[in-house]
Amino acid sequence: LDEPDNYLDVPGKRWLEDQLRATQKTVLLVSHDRALLARAATRIAAIELGAAGNTVWVHGRGFATFAKARQERFARFEELRRRWDEQHAKLRELMLMYKNKAAFNSDMASRYQAAVTRLAKFEEAGPPQAVPLRQQVSMRLSGGRTGRRAVVVEQLELTGLMKPFDAEIWFGDRVAVLGSNGSGKSHFLRLLARGGSSPEPGNTSVDHALIDPVRFTGVARLGARVRPGLIAQTHAHPELIGRTLIEILHRGDDHRDGMGREAAARVLDRYELAKAAEQRYDTLSGGQQARLQILLLQLAGATLLLLDEPTDNLDLESAEALEAGLDAFEGTVIAVTHDRWFARGFDRFLVFGADGSVYEADEPVWDEGRVARSR
């Protein structure tokens, strides 16, 4: 199963987890959903990057112990390499000592040859397995100060989707938007990304992607200096197709300055995109496109991050880097998510309910069913 949980809401994910736990069949599952892995996987096979090629390490237990076991494994590799380097230095030092002595004392020639042989055999056996290469993704999301009220919603109704609701979102809030598929969550983000119900010049989106209009009644108002930036679930950016990553950063656009190629290469490296610098945007993997979108929001100076399923295409290291970046972000974050692990980092939860209502909860609510609509 290759990412079978993508595009599933939480009831769908739970159903999938129950099926995986119940089946007697062998299941090989590719997934980056940490909650699903914790509930359903009994062993973890990790593809590890290496200079000489990738390898697979199998952790014989579940996801709960995976991170600690991998950290301990890497520490063992580092210790073995340290010991090998020490022994190699001693053998080389011994060989050089006998070499110097043999130059003045022929009786030392045999000892010198023995030392040369020992060193050669040691080097031929080679060092222990190298520590696997790890992704070093660093997402530096800066943001900026805005008015205290970042978003004010008054009797907002997403036509044909949800009933009217009110909400106030304050500067610095981390709001997770929860609910089943098709409940209107993405429409809500799109409305905010377009500047709200009556966009002001200071609320212009930093995102160049064409954002489809949303039918609504009521008010959705953005605060002073709130500049929304949207990461859509599909990463569709027609204006980037056919352009390389270096070209995108070098030329800039209306919302961000261009940068020199060396500076562009450095910032791509922080997002583990340096090797893809000369690739066209449309040839990138879903995870690479997602990381680039986050990078572009960083460079454009968004102060309101609107994230639609941001972890769907991110591997574990990138998801953790995003979480760290959001923790340090000076601004407001509103994220639609079905990622139960990711939602732990949020402090407010706006739930789109099965009855068409929108309400705030003190903790994540994952059991809302599909909205019943007249047909």
Regions found by a protein language model. Give the residues of each.
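ABC ATP-binding cassette signature C-motif
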Residues: 1-77, 139, 145-375
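Flexible nucleotide-interacting loop at or near the entrance of a catalytic core
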Residues: 73-164
